[in-house]
Structures are given as C-alpha cells and as structure tokens.
Amino acid sequence: MRIIKKIQIEATTDKVWGIFAHDFDTASEWMSSIPNSYGESTSKAFEGNKSEGRVCELNGNPNGIKATEEFLAYDEKNKTCTVDVTLLNTPAIMPILGNILDFEIQDIGENRSEVTWTITSKLKPHAYLIYPIVKFGLGIFVGQITEELKYFVEQGQPHPRKLKATAKLKLAANGQS
C-alpha cells in the first residue's frame, strides 16, 4: 500500500530539513502521535546526518508500542531521505508491520518549500481483508503528520493536536480521564 502526501510550507528548505532530518531524534516535540522519542545508533551513518535513527514510544509506555526508525538513504545536499519504520510490541490485530518513508523537500519560491511524504506500508496478511479501511486510516494519519510539521516549522510551536495529546497523556498518567 502506498500513500503520497504533499504540503507547502512557508519556510526555506533548510529550515524544514533542519527540523525533520537534523532534529530527527526529537520528533516527539511536534508529532501528536509520539509522546516520547530518542536517538538510537544503527550501523548506518550518512554524511551530514546528525542521527542514525530513533525510537518513538507511541503510547507513552517505555515497554509499550514503539516504532524503530532507521535511515536507509540520506542525501543532505538534495534534502531527501528514506526511513525504514518497524513497529514493535503491537497487538496482533494491528494490520501494519511498518512503513518505508521517502521524504523529499523542494524549494518552490522565496521562503517556500514543498514536502512530499511517500509511505509504503508493510502489511500483515489480515490487512488485505480490510485494505480500504487501512488505506483510509493511514492516509488520515499521514495527513496529520504533514500538518503538524507545517505548523511546527511555520509557528515555532507544536500543533494544537500535539498539545491536546500531551495533556491527555498527563491526565491518564495521573489517573484522571
């Protein structure tokens, strides 16, 4: 399954690339679906890259659902990369094993960039039984991530969706709903 999302951002390609690629380990600062993220060394280092990979805790539990993300390709000059995302500790019903993300930024004018996210999902066999639902849900999810990156780059602060997710997680940690 493949999902392609494009979004225009009112910022230079250098600024967008800096947040996405150079600050790769800190995705939890702007992505609402990631309560915590941290760098993880892998065997692949690329010239110009400040991170080899990251771990994203997806439910706020260090022993819970995670995504490990490793660069497969990285081009500092052209501002493109490919990231292998593997999901860990997921319930059996989860239809996706992981994703391959191709990320690209193009300069489209003064202080404007266009970001293209191409997600190719690695599906479990039962996902094909509900393929339209999985594709629809993943499309919404990727759309939200692109919106959150745009907001963070342009506004210099997390998207309201991230703030709401963080507040909800804090309430849950304190035993409130």
Predicted ranges, named:
Residues 28, 38-94, 151-155, 160, ...:
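Glycine-rich portal/gate segments that line the openings of hydrophobic small-molecule binding cavities
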Residues 12, 63, 76-78, 108-112:
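Short strand-connecting beta-turns/loops that link adjacent beta-strands
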Residues 11, 66, 125:
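Residues that form or flank phosphate/diphosphate-binding pockets in enzymes
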